[in-house]
Amino acid sequence: MSRFWHFKKFYFTSCYSMQRMRGKIFKNEPLVPMNVTSEHEQVQSISKEESRSLSSNDLNLSADSELQLESEPEIESEQLKNHEDVYEIIRSMVLAADTTLPRLSNNSLTGIYNHWKLNPNDDLPLYNPTKYTPYEFHSQYNQDRSYIITPRLSVTKLLVSSWCELRSFYQVYSGSVRLPSTKAMTQGTKLHSKLEAEVHPEIDTTEIEQFLISNAMSLRELQTTVPAEEETVVIDLGEVEQLAVDWAEMLIERLFSLIMGAEAREILLHGYLNLKNRSFVTNKDEIRESSSVLVSGIVDYIKLQNVTNPSDGTLFDDIHGFVDSAFDQVDNVPLVDLSQFLPEAKQILQNYDFRLTFTDVKTRSARQIPRQESVLEAAKFQTFYYRHFFHLLSRDSRFTYFSLIENAERRGHDVDKPLSILTTISLLRKHYHIFFKDFVKLANGEPIGFSPFDDSAKSIPYDFVSMFQSSDEFSLANPNHNHFLEQISAIDGIEYDSILSPLLKVWKTPPTLRYLAARASQLFNVFNENIGDITSVEYRYNKTSELLSEKVYDYNFSEFQAEVESASKFWNGEREVIPTEDLSRCSYCEFQSKCMVAGGKTTEAVEKKTIGPKIRQFLNECESSSKG
């Protein structure tokens, strides 16, 4: 009689038996995963007696449990013998006697064998033997803890068919082990930074920040009379501050640059994918539903242009003409009032047939583009995701505002927490042309002209005065800023007397993530009627930034939605995983040595090799059933 027949025969009866045994003997203790070794661990040789011991441990039969077993009078000895027979059959199918546990060649294999509780002599099964969907597992067992703290996906994670779906599948259940960075990846990152700096030159505020920190530490000793609950945070380098900087620079500044200069790089985008109906959320009430998964991405390049005449710059002549005539200047830089600029810019854009195009940049270590059709298709769909996200974020400023608020709150951030003084002054220095007029409004407690923010902004005293003094002239009652302004102006020559002096007071409304969400949502909405359907992928040589090729695509919503549905079914565990048919790709895969597809196994061999994993699935189901 075959082993598989034994398995089928005992499948239902033994699950019931295991539940009874767990209830009376094991006290619902969890199933302990087999301790699989990696190449860094010693190979274990298991004798016939050790085989029994290992299997007992695997089923959580400790010495104490066996003693307790003997002390249970209500369990008949014959019944125990039957139970032992069941376990003996299971053990014989899962782990043979005199077995040597092989070393697994990398951490990804070690992770998936431990998570799936597999015998390391077996190949990897082609299906998931656990109760967790890929998304559930990704959100609970992930080497990057930020995905556990804030469950979410990225655009690239949705492109599961790019190389091999089976590899993507195994990567999830390995615990999303990070692969080591390669030289090509490092060079690619440098190229992206270089391209970004060409459009958005970095303003180095290191010296100013060091001066402010040093000055703040000197003044702290003098501020002994300020109650702790009234003290404004001066220095905070936490996650809220980092998100604030990202929103200010990778949303507000980039979108403003897109309006003023026709192009922008590295813009943050996001959407909420409803895994139940396999589509992206389009109304704010649906954002908070548990089935709506946050999906984030960064689009490499967006250009605003006349698609029929790319050299046409009349739109930007009009916008610059308006800005130069409407706003005062400091150091020949207009101080833009966003409350006035946003509606005017939107009106100007509507008068022109200019459209946004969306580009992703792929870096290559050789002067050739990918030959695999699936890789090219995935790159195309990546640009479709970015185009779709921008469309959703530009449709309705209220939707985008609440979408950003939800984004921050899912990360555990308080959107009404005042930003630190250091973050505020840094944003002011780098982007005073955008933020100065708004900061004046916040300081005076004036509305910014966006009702969702104006109606909900909290009035919290924000001390933007005490820290901007020198220690030799410090006073809480009568602050004197003359020496301080001389010192900070000497660092980089900016007219701080013009952009800082009007703000040196206790603000009535502090700068917060909520404020940044409001302005970002309005800037997205400026482009509401200018979303184009052209996307492209640039392939660049990472050593020289040479453009090797550019693939241009027309956005197709039906085609895109089919891709979204397929990705949703993958992450929901609603369809079978499709392995690659190109086995030459397997040589680049960390799971190759244990993959049945990579090994070219026949259908009969694959069926035979899945018996062991089916037993593991059975054991996991019994464990879940006993806990329920």
Swiss-Prot record:
Gene encoding it? DEM1
Query: PANTHER family, from UniProt?
Result: EXONUCLEASE V
The role this protein plays is: Single strand DNA specific 5' exonuclease involved in mitochondrial DNA replication and recombination. Releases dinucleotides as main products of catalysis. Has the capacity to slide across 5'double-stranded DNA or 5'RNA sequences and resumes cutting two nucleotides downstream of the double-stranded-to-single-stranded junction or RNA-to-DNA junction, respectively.
Protein name, entry field: Exonuclease V, mitochondrial
InterPro entries hit by this protein: EXOV
Query: What organism is the protein native to?
Result: Candida albicans (strain SC5314 / ATCC MYA-2876)
- Give the cofactor binding note: Binds 1 [4Fe-4S] cluster.
Keywords assigned by UniProt, alphabetized: 4Fe-4S, DNA-binding, Exonuclease, Hydrolase, Iron, Iron-sulfur, Magnesium, Metal-binding, Mitochondrion, Nuclease, Transit peptide
The enzyme's E.C. designation: 3.1.-.-
Query: What's the main place this protein lives?
Result: mitochondrion
> What Pfam family is a match for this entry?
Exo5
Any one biological process term the GO annotation gives: interstrand cross-link repair
